[in-house]
Every structure is written in structure tokens, then in C-alpha cells.
Swiss-Prot record:
Top-rank taxon: Eukaryota
Gene knockout outcome: Distorted trichomes and reduced numbers of root hairs.
Gene source species: Arabidopsis thaliana (Mouse-ear cress)
Keywords assigned by UniProt, alphabetized: Chloroplast, Glycolysis, Lyase, Magnesium, Metal-binding, Phosphoprotein, Plastid, Transit peptide
Family, per entry: Belongs to the enolase family.
One term of GO molecular function: magnesium ion binding
Tissue specificity note: Highly expressed in young roots, young siliques, and shoot apex. Lowly expressed in young leaves, stems and cotyledons.
Protein name per its UniProtKB record: Enolase 1, chloroplastic
Reactions performed catalytically: (2R)-2-phosphoglycerate = phosphoenolpyruvate + H2O
Residues that bind Mg(2+): 290, 340, 365
NCBIfam families from the UniProt entry: eno (TIGR01060)
Pfam families to which the protein is assigned, alphabetical: Enolase_C (PF00113), Enolase_N (PF03952)
This protein's GO CC annotations: chloroplast; chloroplast stroma; phosphopyruvate hydratase complex
UniProt keyword Plastid present: yes
């Protein structure tokens, strides 16, 4: 059978996420769409910059819960999906759920979908997608609440992400380049991946109180080498865990890390050291932790490291001062370079005390919730020295970029992050490169919703060629 030549627009090579002909989509709205990828090349004829349509739907995330997906149509279709967290900060923008316990246990997002299709979509028709800040401001005005509770942050974010992709497509540049230009970032930098290889806390069914035990290949010379190092340590760790705890202990948590049934957090760190050494990367791979301490903070100001077992005898309850001493012991005994959320989101004094006594990176997640106001307060109180950037905590691309810029201006590090409930959407990979954040965490080198981000970073590095890897300078790339 003779081969026919594909139309020129289907031959082009694109890196960033999916799009199809917008006109064809509007005419027939087929259930199965042929995609081409937005970003790397652009035709001689300028692409249409105006919104012609917006369509939202309910899809399912990696934990089996509903989430929002948004198609935005110009000449092409740009699709984005919204993540969701398990351990969420009380100051995050509101994730709108339906609350009907008879449908998806109350976790449906049909109201958020309705808000997009009936309230947001009509307002965006004819809007120029290259003006990200203007589009986001329009949605914030339409919502009119401090925490995006009218439309839902998950509704607003889905549209905002698709607008950003459409802006890149309209300009004929990769998504990461569009983000670089939008944010005013001088140099593109490949981030150090923080692989979450042991899961605890709210992400796993074991007894570990602390949520994430991560490895950071700071000694690599490229992202691809860093990924190889992380993958090899991950598989080495699996062998160690299988030998020590049995096959069942090799089951993975929400983010692809192993969840061995150990309670002693120090034991988790020893497992990492053993795997790093056995894989041959001692000195080249450092350790990071996400404690997620708000999950086990008690009303009396203490912290229960056995919070998963209720009731318990209180033997593992520590004061904030004792918990800080435990962190300092960990830092002394292990090559730890980063600790996230070591204390509760409102325990400002404990944050500041630890910050003044250690020289590692202290990352604010629940403390900051990617909110410029919380960031400003933390800068004033000298509570931490790095931002965990989660786009769904704040709800728009514009505010996410501003949070990163404010943090960098204060001399902080910026770690772009996924959520435990993820999709195949890989926006944050381009975001990390475009902002030159220097570091990203998006789970273990396992589970497709995690690898979609890492694989996108491999593609970006391949396309950019001689691009700098943040390495040891991940805090200030």
C-alpha cells in the first residue's frame, strides 16, 4: 500500500502538551482526538491568538478521584488537567468539590466544571491568550473572593494552565520559553530532581510520621544523568527493602515511593544511605525530607510522631524544641540538604528558631501555600529560606510566577512541586525550566503520572542541548 505524505502541520515536531485543530474541534467535538504538540516550531502564518471556545470536563486523577480538565480552543486545542493534594494547608485556595456523598464519595467536581463552562467560558471568548496576567485577572475579578471559593481554584487553574499553553502556541515557542519570557527569567536551567523514594505520612499506609524521604542527585552533570542516578538508587533501595522487610514492603505509595512498615524515621534515612552507597553514588546524592508536620501537630502545640495509631500511649509525642533537636541530629548524622514543613503551618516561632540554627534549605509548603502574602510574612519573620511552588495552592499561573519571583528576590530557593493526586499533565516540568527554579519534586521514578514530568524534562534537555544543570547550586541557580 502506498504511503501518503502527511499534511505539513502533522509533520512538525513539538515538545509541549497536546493540541488539535480548534476549528475541527468546534465543528465536530470528536470523542477521540488526534494530537500534535505545541511549542517548538511555528508556521510562517501567525497563529490565532484569540479564544474561540472553552470546554471543561471531569476526569480521574492518580488516586481515583475526580478532577478538572480544560480544553481551550484558538486555532488549536490546548488541554490541561488539575492536580490535587492529600495533605493540604488550611491557607490554600479553595478546591471546589461537590460534596454529594452518593457520587464519588463527595469528591465530584461537576460544580467547578459548570462554573467554567457557564461562567468563565463566555467571558474569555475573543481574549488574547498571550496576555496571561490579563486573563488571570479577569477570572479573579469574576470570582471576587479571597480564596477563589466562588469558582473554585481548581476551575480557575485549569483554565489558566490552558491559557499559558495557548500563549506559547500563539507565539510559536515551547511552553518553557513562553514561561521564561512571561516571568523575565534570564537563563533556562535544568532542575535537580528530588525523588521521593520512601513514602510515609498521609501518602502511605505505614507507620512513618514523616511524609517524604527524598534523594537529590546534586553531583550529576546533567538532568539525564541525575535521572539515571535516581533510578538506579530507587531500584537498589527496592532490593534492600525486599531483603529486609519482604516483598509486601515493596508496595508503593501515592507518589511511587516505597512504603515499608517502619516507624522510626531515622531508619528511613539509614535505608537511603545504604541504597546510595550500594549504588555507588556516595557524595553525589544528598537527602531531602518533607516532614509535613501540620499532619501530626497537636492542639497543645506538641507533635505526635505516632499519629497514625489512635489512640496511642503518647510515647512519641515531642515538644517543638525536642522536634527541632531531632532535626539537628538528622542533619549532623546524614547528608541532608533540605527539610520541608518541619513544623506546623502556624508555628512561626519554631520555624524561625530552626532557621537561625541550621544552614540547610528549609522549605515552606503548608506554611506558604504559594501565596504572595504568606511569603511576605515569612520573609519578614525569617521563618524559612525556600518556597515549595504548587500551582494549585494559589490557582493561577500569574500568581504562581509572582510567588517564585518574590521568593527569589528574597534570596530564597524555589522548588516546583507536583501533588500526590496527579494526572498525565506535565506543565510543571516546563514551569521549572522556564522559571529556572533549580529544583523540582514530582515523585519517584515510578508511576506514569510522575514520569510524565520527568520524561518531559528529558525531552527539554535534549532539545536545548548545551543547557546548564543546577547541580550543587540548586538553591540559587
Amino acid at each position: 500500500m502506498a504511503l501518503t505524505t502527511k499534511p505539513h502541520h502533522l509533520q512538525r515536531s513539538f515538545l509541549s502538551p497536546s493540541r488539535v485543530s480548534g476549528e475541527r474541534y468546534l465543528e465536530s467535538a470528536p470523542s477521540c482526538l488526534r494530537f500534535r504538540r505545541s511549542g517548538v516550531q511555528c508556521s510562517v502564518v501567525a497563529k490565532e491568538c484569540r479564544v474561540k471556545g472553552v470546554k471543561a470536563r471531569q476526569i480521574i486523577d492518580s488516586r481515583g478521584n475526580p478532577t478538572v480538565e480544560v480544553d481551550l480552543i484558538t486555532d488549536d486545542l490546548y488541554r490541561s488537567a488539575v492536580p490535587s493534594g492529600a495533605s493540604t494547608g488550611i491557607y490554600e485556595a479553595l478546591e471546589l468539590r461537590d460534596g454529594d456523598k452518593s457520587v464519588y464519595g463527595g469528591k465530584g467536581v461537576l460544580q467547578a466544571i459548570k462554573n467554567i463552562n457557564e461562567l468563565v467560558a463566555p467571558k474569555l471568548i475573543g481574549v488574547d491568550v498571550r496576555n496571561q496576567a490579563d486573563v488571570d485577572a479577569l477570572m479573579l475579578e469574576l470570582d471576587g473572593t479571597p480564596n477563589k471559593s466562588k469558582l473554585g481554584a481548581n476551575a480557575i487553574l485549569g483554565v489558566s494552565l490552558s491559557v499559558c499553553r495557548a500563549g506559547a502556541g500563539a507565539k510559536g515557542v515551547p511552553l518553557y520559553k513562553h514561561i521564561q519570557e512571561t516571568s523575565g527569567t534570564k537563563e533556562l536551567v535544568m532542575p535537580v530532581p528530588a525523588f521521593n523514594v520512601i513514602n510515609g505520612g498521609s501518602h502511605a499506609g505505614n507507620s512513618l510520621a514523616m511524609q517524604e524521604f527524598m534523594i537529590l542527585p546534586v553531583g550529576a552533570t546533567s538532568f539525564s544523568e541525575a535521572f539515571q542516578m535516581g533510578s538506579e538508587v530507587y531500584h537498589t533501595l527496592k532490593g534492600i527493602i525486599k531483603t529486609k522487610y519482604g516483598q509486601d514492603a515493596c508496595n508503593v505509595g501515592d507518589e511511587g515511593g516505597f512504603a515499608p512498615n517502619v516507624q522510626d524515621n531515622r531508619e528511613g534515612l539509614v535505608l537511603l544511605i545504604d541504597a546510595i552507597e550500594k549504588a555507588g553514588y556516595t557524595g553525589k546524592i544528598k537527602i531531602g525530607m518533607d516532614v509535613a508536620a501540620s499532619e501530626f501537630f497537636m492542639k497543645d502545640g506538641r507533635y505526635d510522631l505516632n499519629f497514625k495509631k489512635q489512640p496511642n500511649d503518647g510515647a512519641h509525642v515531642l515538644s517543638a524544641e525536642s522536634l527541632a533537636d531531632l532535626y539537628r541530629e538528622f542533619i549532623k548524622d546524614f547528608p541532608i540538604v533540605s527539610i520541608e514543613d518541619p513544623f506546623d503551618q502556624d508555628d512561626w516561632s519554631s520555624w524561625a528558631s530552626l532557621q537561625s540554627s541550621v544552614d540547610i534549605q528549609l522549605v515552606g509548603d503548608d506554611l506558604l501555600v504559594t501565596n504572595p502574602k504568606r511569603i511576605a510574612e515569612a520573609i519578614k519573620k525569617q521563618s524559612c529560606n525556600a518556597l515549595l511552588l504548587k500551582v494549585n495552592q494559589i490557582g493561577t499561573v500569574t500568581e504562581s510566577i509572582q510567588a517564585a519571583l518574590d521568593s527569589k528576590a528574597a534570596g530564597w530557593g524555589v522548588m516546583v512541586s507536583h501533588r500526590s493526586g496527579e494526572t498525565e499533565d506535565n506543565f510543571i516540568a516546563d514551569l521549572s525550566v522556564g522559571l529556572a527554579s533549580g529544583q523540582i519534586k514530582t515523585g519517584a521514578p515510578c508511576r506514569s503520572e510522575r514520569l510524565s514530568k520527568y520524561n518531559q524534562l528529558l525531552r527539554i534537555e535534549e532539545e536545548l542541548g548545551n543547557v546548564r544543570y543546577a547541580g550543587e547550586a540548586f538553591r540559587s541557580p
